[in-house]
Amino acid sequence: MKHSFSRFFGFGEKEEEPEIAEHDTNKEEILEIPVHAIVPNRFQPRTIFSDEKIKELAMTIHTHGIIQPIVVRHTEDEGQYELIAGERRWRAVQTLEWEKIPAIIKDFSDTETASVALIENLQREELSSIEEAHAYARLLELHDLTQEALAQRLGKGQSTIANKLRLLKLPEPVQDAIMEKKITERHARALIPLKQPEFQVTLLAEIIEKSLNVKQTEDRVVKMLEQNKQKPKPRRKAFSRDTRIAMNTIRQSLSMVEDSGVRLNTEEEEFEEYIQLTIRIPK
C-alpha cells in the first residue's frame, strides 16, 4: 500500500515517518503458509473479480513469482488465516495450484482489518462506483468520521465522497446495473432527482433498452418531473340514486315554498364526500 494504515486513521499516529512505513514489509517476517488455510476477508469491498485479470496475474506470478507477500491474520480456528490484503494474488495462486504462499501475519482488530482492505482497494482505483460508495460508507461508520474528515484523510474532494454515497440511495436494480456496467455512474446520478424508486427503475429500463446517453437521460428526467407536477384533478364521486332522489325532493319543496310567496336564498356546494345546501330565509 502507498501509505500506512496509521497515517489514515490515527493508530500509532506519527510514530513512524511515511518513508519507513511504506517499507514495513522489509522489517517483518515473511512466512510460507498453506493456500488452503486462508479464508477471504469478510470486509472485502470488492464483490466482482475479473477472471481474465486473475489469469493475467497468475501468468505474471508463474514467471516472476510473488514480489509482494499477502497480509493475513489468525482466525479463531487454529491453523486458519483471514486475508487482510492481497486477495487477487491469493486467487491467482489458487489457479496455479500452489500449496503455499508468502505472507505476513498481522495482529489486527476487525476495525483495522476492514480499514486496510477498504483503503487498499480504494487506492487501486479498480472498484466499481457502488463498491467504492460502500467502502466510503463503511469507513465513515468504522471511524465515526464526517464526510469532510474522510475526504481529507483519503486525499479526495468532499463532493466526490458525497456523490458516491448518493448512489446508495438508488434502488437495487439501478445499483446492479452500475455493477454490471449496463449504465454509467453519470446515468445513475441523473436518476436521483426522480426520488420515487418505481420511476427510477422504469427509466432505467428505458435507458438500457434505447441506449440513452446521459444528456437524453437528463432530458427524460426533466420531462417526467414536469408530468408528475401536473396532477390530475380528483374525480368527483357520481351521485347515487338515493342522493339524486333526496336532492330532487329538497329542490321541489323549496320551489313550493317560493311559489307561496316566500323569497329564499339557496346555495349548493359539492364536495368530495358530500353536498352542502345552505338556505337563507329573510325575516
UniProtKB/Swiss-Prot annotation:
SUPFAM superfamilies: KorB DNA-binding domain-like, ParB/Sulfiredoxin. InterPro entries: Chromosome_partition/occlusion, HTH_ParB/Spo0J, Nucleoid_occlusion_protein, ParB/RepB/Spo0J, ParB/Sulfiredoxin_dom, ParB/Sulfiredoxin_sf. Keywords: Cell cycle, Cell division, Cytoplasm, DNA-binding, Septation. GO terms for biological process: chromosome segregation; division septum assembly; positive regulation of sporulation resulting in formation of a cellular spore. The keyword Cell division applies. GO terms for molecular function: DNA binding. Gene3D superfamilies: 1.10.10.2830, 3.90.1530.30. It is found in: Cytoplasm, Nucleoid. One of its GO terms (cellular component) is nucleoid. Its main location: cytoplasm. Residues 1-21 are annotated as: Disordered. Residues 148-167 bind DNA. Belongs to the ParB family. NCBIfam families: nucleoid_noc, parB_part. Effects nucleoid occlusion by binding relatively nonspecifically to DNA and preventing the assembly of the division machinery in the vicinity of the nucleoid, especially under conditions that disturb the cell cycle. It helps to coordinate cell division and chromosome segregation by preventing the formation of the Z ring through the nucleoid, which would cause chromosome breakage. This is Nucleoid occlusion protein. The gene is noc.
